Amino acid sequence: VGFKAGVKEYKLTYYTPSYETKDTDILAAFRVTPQPGVPPEEAGAAVAAESSTGTWTTVWTDGLTSLDRYKGRCYHIEPVAGEETQFIAYVAYPLDLFEEGSVTNMFTSIVGNVFGFKALRALRLEDLRIPPAYVKTFQGPPHGIQVERDKLNKYGRPLLGCTIKPKLGLSAKNYGRAVYECLRGGLDFTKDDENVNSQPFMRWRDRFLFCTEALYKAQSETGEIKGHYLNATAGTCEEMIKRAVFARELGVPIVMHDYLTGGFTANTSLAHYCRDNGLLLHIHRAMHAVIDRQKNHGIHFRVLAKALRMSGGDHIHSGTVVGKLEGEREITLGFVDLLRDDFIEKDRSRGLFFTQDWVSLPGVLPVASGGIHVWHMPALTEIFGDDSVLQFGGGTLGHPWGNAPGAVANRVALEACVQARNEGRDLAREGNEIIREASKWSPELAAACEIWKEIKFEFEAMDTL
């Protein structure tokens, strides 16, 4: 026989510290927690093997291909500061292992089997470097930031949104009424909640019709372009596209999808439809915390954000840094830049393990949403800058005078913050003062300031470096 059968150590084949990474390799950084007694090199090599060409033994068909051409390689291992049992393993994958334009296939390979691997106590994918050669096989976001601004004719400020609440139980007509009030008051967008699909109390077609009516009415009264994220997420891809087609026929500007529960295949199909038909696509990340919240196991959200930019979406929820949901500031800003910018430098202080070059793939607007209200406006304006969507659900609808005044309060607060920033004032230091000044001539804002002056969601973030 030309080979020796039996179980052999992965590190003999898959640990190659002298390997020079290629410009076309997909690079991954894994946080590896090996079982006691498993050396880090063996664990890192095992990850490289099991997520590429390896299996647990030598097989005779290995001789029919060139392992050197196709194998993943663990090319560097470093300890994690402050964690004795954890290591960062860097793995390089040859580009030929992946189908072009398929996020689904990329994830099936890189995070498919290997996460259940016995020799590892835990495994987390911290970051991916997508090479330009692979990026170029994706359409990416249907439109991107600049095209969206041109479609909406809104420049020089963040966009304002609001999720309609109560999220489940309203009839379509009452739902449309709530949409109209918010848009008339000064918001740019309203949003279907992620779990509003087509339930017995409100079927999707009724909702689409009433929301569109609300949108056109608000548009004609305010002279501004308005949008409502019509959630097209459905149980089958065919049904999802049917809903998107109906939205296009109604002439609305934007639809929405839950990309993790819907899946990357469905999401990419919808993104292609949206580009072909001039619809913007808002992406909600329902289920992300199942995957990304544990510090030592799962996939970090920055990887899910990169995957979404490849699969396609014009907006994606990305934490607030200040509200009720998870998000450490530097880490959040790291993946916000990954979503918006063309070229992002490696920066370990922001959790960025690799330099990412998107080669002019359109950008995605980060959406800050979850437990935010008018007092957060200066911080949000400073942290996220102009290219973002700030979404106040309860922070609009919870206004004591109703939805429209709640919308007015948010719009006034935003315009005041943008003006103050443009005049050179420091929003971080003078934020409260700016909001107070503005509330003197806006009774709606004054009422909002009063009701939310004490609300805080202060817990330590789990997602620290």
UniProtKB/Swiss-Prot annotation:
The protein's required cofactors: Mg(2+)
Keyword Chloroplast applies: yes
Entry comment on modification after translation: The disulfide bond which can form in the large chain dimeric partners within the hexadecamer appears to be associated with oxidative stress and protein turnover.
GO molecular function: magnesium ion binding; monooxygenase activity; ribulose-bisphosphate carboxylase activity
TM region positions: none
GO CC list: chloroplast
Cofactor note: Binds 1 Mg(2+) ion per subunit.
EC number(s) stated in the UniProt entry for this protein: 4.1.1.39
Primary site of residence: plastid
CDD domains: RuBisCO_large_I
Pfam family, one: RuBisCO_large_N
NCBIfam families reported for this sequence: PRK04208.1
Record function comment: RuBisCO catalyzes two reactions: the carboxylation of D-ribulose 1,5-bisphosphate, the primary event in carbon dioxide fixation, as well as the oxidative fragmentation of the pentose substrate in the photorespiration process. Both reactions occur simultaneously and in competition at the same active site.
Note: The basic functional RuBisCO is composed of a large chain homodimer in a 'head-to-tail' conformation. In form I RuBisCO this homodimer is arranged in a barrel-like tetramer with the small subunits forming a tetrameric 'cap' on each end of the 'barrel'.
Protein name (Swiss-Prot/TrEMBL): Ribulose bisphosphate carboxylase large chain
Gene: rbcL
